[in-house]
Amino acid sequence: MKRFHVHAHVEDLPTSVAFYSKMFGAEPTRVESDYAKWMIEDPRINFAISTRGGKPGVDHLGIQTDSAEELVELKARAKAADMTLLDVGETSCCYARSDKYWLTDPQGIAWEQFHTLGNIPVFGESAPAAAGEATAACCAGSAPRGKAVEVAVKPAASTSCC
């Protein structure tokens, strides 16, 4: 089974944790000084926030798989569709060790597809990144970061809805 993933940048982690805990009706499954994550079952989502990265907003979207086989299936589908992907293999990021790759949609939004292998005690275990990359939400400095998902804080005069 797969799980939808969202990672957002926040300025104030404690305030955001309080908000999302109330919204989800659940406490985070992991909390660190710069990061929190909820593994919600209904709807099935891995929702993460961190103080790392650029301006507040959605950093990237993703699909987390429960098995290595599901990740292989997603990767095969992407390759069959001639999608350019960056396979970073096994990597450590966001307090977890995962096998992952990245895609960027036609609008420039980054998508992470990954299978979590286990938890780690630090945000990332990779070598120090170049200037500007050290605070990125996702530790794969060479990943196609795409552009942030712009979500208006105040409604515009003319709004669209799904």
Predicted features along the sequence, with ranges:
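Core segments of cupin and vicinal oxygen chelate
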Residues: 1-2, 7-46
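N-terminal beta-strand motif that seeds the catalytic metal site of vicinal oxygen chelate
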Residues: 1-14, 44, 61, 122-162
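Short aromatic/hydrophobic contact patches that present stacked aromatics
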Residues: 5-7, 37, 60-62, 100-102
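Vicinal oxygen chelate
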Residues: 13, 62-110, 118-121
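A short linear hydrophobic-aromatic micro-motif
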Residues: 27, 46-49, 84-89
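Short acidic/glycine-enriched loop/turn segments that link adjacent beta-strands
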Residues: 32-35, 55-57, 94-99
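Short, charged/polar, Gly/Pro-enriched secondary-structure boundary elements
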Residues: 44-48, 109-110
